[in-house]
Amino acid sequence: MYQIAVCDDEEAIRSQIIRVLSAHPSREAFSIVEFSSGEVLLNSLRAGQAYLLLILDIQLQDQNGVTVGRLLREELGDNATQVLYISAHTQYAMELFDVRPIN
């Protein structure tokens, strides 16, 4: 079983993403871990927790989602975890290329 992390500081958005993921036909193949804080997610990653996929808001209250992705790639050397960014803001689009999110 693989794990998917959902990180958004807005509970309504996290809940909606989790609801959509939970309706997937292969739901029994993965577990969902939710985070309301980029810092808590980073602590989990630094502690060695592995996720197949991070669904990550760009504008978090305590941490920029782009920074979380950059630390995942550069500090932790994790190039295997897929990163899917969600945001209503377009100003970060060019920064995302450095983090290599899902195409």
What is each model feature region?
Residues 11-33:
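Two-component/phosphorelay signaling modules centered on CheY-like receiver
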